[in-house]
Curated annotation (Swiss-Prot):
Organism: Drimys granadensis
Protein name (Swiss-Prot/TrEMBL): Photosystem I P700 chlorophyll a apoprotein A1
Gene: psaA
Catalysed reaction equations from the record: reduced [plastocyanin] + hnu + oxidized [2Fe-2S]-[ferredoxin] = oxidized [plastocyanin] + reduced [2Fe-2S]-[ferredoxin]
GO molecular function: 4 iron, 4 sulfur cluster binding; chlorophyll binding; electron transfer activity; magnesium ion binding; oxidoreductase activity
Note accompanying the cofactor annotation: P700 is a chlorophyll a/chlorophyll a' dimer, A0 is one or more chlorophyll a, A1 is one or both phylloquinones and FX is a shared 4Fe-4S iron-sulfur center.
């Protein structure tokens, strides 16, 4: 650690009134670009307007100005998020059965949307129990509201109004920090101060406030709710906060206040800061006292982490020093120069953040079902399936975004003259080895994983079940996964002596937990069927990575096109007269990567949906007999391609296909409509620009004949635009089809 002399106290970090607020400017489409601001000559203008409106790099090359625009746009984004949240809470307050659900969450479904009768749409208002008719929601809001101690619709109203106020504040902040007091570039590049605020402030104090809220408000209210007290009889949140005796009745150690904390007698707090593990048998969720303890611990960690870096006081680590000291045996100059890259290229910074956040989102998807955090979440199968699917898709998109911005960084921000023999340079120098090895891995995984299925389909067709790979014939048990499960199941009392239960029931060993006659969670068995589909996961993930990584590593140059960097991030082909150079731009790799990402995530959510219905979700009789939704058919049916088509896609589509005339009929229409949107994409993906230009010209001729030709000349979409429209409809159509299929099925049978 280097101790430097303290820097001068006051730095002026903002410019006052740098950009005047002008409504005339806002009213002029394309004011950010000289060409676009001239107005439309051809229909391509509207596409360029949309493509470049938020591409701040194309407006100016001044990094400070770009940074200010991005910063201001973030406030706009936060404003939209607050507005959306406000809408969710408002629906809970105005149109929902939240109070009824709170009184009986096992028999009443959550609903926060009631359809108005105009021409018969009121059929969509299904009976969700307790005499309430509405659309069943699967977002998990009811469960999170209960966990946070909300007991009335009035509280939801107040929160909704609060969120609206915050949305307004964010809009104001976005305007203020661009037009009135805009930060200087030095402020955006002061990473140590940023770490201090983000780690200690956002994550540290944020977690601490949440832990405080949980201890003082959520825990006592949930204890009353679990005991069956009527929500209207429970004291209001502020009474718990202001009146310590009220809490001391539930948790006697509260009477001692902060004394145990300062006398280091912390075990006194073990009543409400627990380390139980497992699930609460009443609600089927994690113990809320465990969650409070967790957030307190996280807060301490991040408060410490936020104070490790050198800010105005001359003590602590400098990030540049840390990075430059980081040299491995094979990495040459190591991370030298990385500090400069990450403080001058926001694309590089964003790429890292997207990769991390995308991975984290996928981790969240897997924990939401294996360690369900909110009360009664585990028995709401529709919500469980929705949350898993949602977080998987979001994670997939964020990871593709990481590759996109890494490639933009390579094209726009990377300076090969100043980067010599550092980590990135070394990776680029042996990119051929990386890509060819990855390609080999993809071929190996593809042939072997698919080959196992094809073998099974063939043996099945020939009537030779004894020659199939299955749990009852030739076993391919996932022994490593089973070993991991077993290690975790046996951890309490062994490798984790402090824990009473393993982290998740899914590991095995423990009993099942049932709430209101429905299975919340039980040990999940893994067998040959899972071994097969996991290798399909490995295959699709590796192909996605191959496409995206090739796009990044060859973004600036390749043997085929040595001067690729000059052509930019997106271009259709390397100019006229050079055949075989189409689909080589970095943008095209993102385009192709999106399809494989869609492929990969689809297999994951199909696997999850079927596995849970077959081996986990179901009802339990008074005698303790579990009946699963699809009766455990996953292990024998999913080992052939035909089984996936017949027993998953076809068998489980019956609910969405037969939904007409029921409250689920909207899903039937979405299922049809989204198939149409998906098919529509193929028109853009399978036809060339020339075909459409030719067609347009004869249509324009007809308009001229009738003297109704427009002043703006119609043009066919460019090649890149056509691909963009195509992939968008492909993904949206595919995702909405899956959504309708999943929800109609799980709401009908779950």
């Amino acid at each position: 650690m280097i101790i430097r002399s303290p820097e001068p106290e006051v730095k002026i970090l903002v410019d006052r009134d740098p950009v005047k607020t002008s409504f005339e400017e806002w009213a002029r489409p394309g004011h950010f670009s000289r060409t676009i601001a001239k107005g439309p000559e051809t229909t391509t203008w509207i596409w360029n307007l949309h493509a470049d409106a938020h591409d701040f790099d194309s407006h100016t090359s001044d990094l400070e100005e770009i940074s200010r625009k991005v910063f201001s746009a973030h406030f706009g984004q936060l404003s939209i998020i607050f507005l959306w949240l406000s809408g969710m809470y408002f629906h809970g307050a105005r149109f929902s059965n939240y109070e009824a659900w709170l009184s009986d969450p096992t028999h009443i479904g959550p609903s926060a949307q009631v359809v108005w009768p105009i021409v018969g749409q009121e059929i969509l208002n299904g009976d969700v129990g307790g005499g309430f008719r509405g659309i069943q929601i699967t977002s998990g809001f009811f469960q999170i509201w209960r966990a946070s101690g909300i007991t009335s619709e009035l509280q939801l109203y107040c929160t909704a109004i609060g969120a609206l106020v915050f949305a307004g504040l964010m809009l104001f902040a976005g305007w203020f920090h661009y037009h009135k007091a805009a930060p200087k570039l030095a402020w955006f590049q002061d990473v140590e101060s940023m770490l201090n605020h983000h780690l200690a402030g956002l994550l540290g104090l944020g977690s601490l406030s949440w832990a405080g809220h949980q201890v003082h408000v959520s825990l006592p209210i949930n204890q009353f709710l679990d005991a069956g007290v009527d929500p209207k009889e429970i004291p209001l949140p502020h009474e718990f906060i202001l009146n310590r005796d009220l809490l001391a009745q539930l948790y006697p150690s509260f009477a001692e206040g902060a004394t145990p904390f300062f006398t280091l007698n912390w075990s006194k707090y073990a009543e409400f800061l627990t380390f139980r593990g497992g699930l609460d048998p009443v609600t089927g969720g994690l113990w809320l006292t465990d969650i409070a303890h967790h957030h307190l611990a996280i807060a301490i960690l991040f408060l410490i982490a936020g104070h490790m870096y050198r800010t105005n006081w001359g003590i602590g680590h400098g990030l540049k020093d840390i990075l430059e000291a980081h040299k491995g045996p094979f990495t040459g100059q190591g991370h030298k120069g990385l500090y400069e890259i990450l403080t001058t290229s926001w694309h590089a910074q964003l790429s890292l953040n997207l990769a991390m956040l995308g991975s984290l989102t996928i981790v969240v998807a897997h924990h939401m079902y294996s360690m369900p955090p909110y009360p009664y979440l585990a028995i709401d199968y529709g919500t469980q399936l929705s949350l898993f699917t949602h977080h998987m898709w979001i994670g997939g998109f964020l990871i593709v975004g990481a590759a996109a911005h890494a490639a933009i960084f390579m094209v726009r921000d990377y300076d090969p003259t100043t980067r010599y023999n550092d980590l990135l340079d070394r990776v680029l120098r042996h990119r051929d080895a990386i890509i060819s090895h990855l390609n080999w891995a993809c071929i190996f995984l593809g042939f072997h994983s698919f080959g196992l299925y094809i073998h099974n389909d063939t043996m099945s067709a020939l009537g030779r079940p004894q020659d199939m790979f299955s749990d009852t014939a030739i076993q391919l048990q996932p022994i490593f996964a089973q070993w991991v499960q077993n290690t975790h199941a046996l951890a309490p009392g062994a490798t984790a002596p402090g824990a009473t239960t393993s982290t998740s029931l899914t590991w095995g060993g423990g009993d099942l937990i049932a709430v209101g006659g429905k299975v919340a969670l039980l040990p999940i068995p893994l067998g040959t069927a899972d071994f097969l589909v996991h290798h399909i996961h490995a295959f699709t993930i590796h192909v996605t990575v191959l496409i995206l990584l090739k796009g990044v590593l060859f973004a600036r140059s390749s043997r085929l096109i040595p001067d690729k960097a000059n052509l930019g991030f997106r271009f259709p082909c390397d100019g006229p007269g050079r055949g075989g150079t189409c689909q080589v731009s970095a943008w095209d790799h993102v385009f192709l990567g999106l399809f494989w990402m869609y492929n990969a995530i689809s297999v994951v959510i199909f696997h999850f949906s079927w596995k849970m219905q077959s081996d986990v979700w179901g009802s339990i009789s008074d005698q303790g007999v579990v009946t699963h939704i699809t009766g455990g058919n996953f292990a024998q049916s999913s080992i052939t391609i035909n089984g996936w088509l017949r027993d998953f896609l076809w068998a489980q589509a019956s609910q969405v296909i037969q939904s007409y005339g029921s409250s689920l009929s909207a899903y039937g229409l979405f299922f049809l409509g989204a198939h149409f949107v998906w098919a529509f994409s193929l028109m853009f993906l399978f036809s060339g620009r020339g075909y459409w230009q030719e067609l347009i010209e004869s249509i324009v001729w007809a308009h001229n004949k009738l003297k109704v030709a427009p002043a703006t000349q119609p043009r066919a979409l460019s090649i890149v635009q056509g691909r963009a429209v195509g992939v968008t409809h492909y993904l949206l159509g595919g995702i909405a089809t899956t959504w309708a299929f999943f929800l109609a099925r799980i709401i009908a049978v779950g």
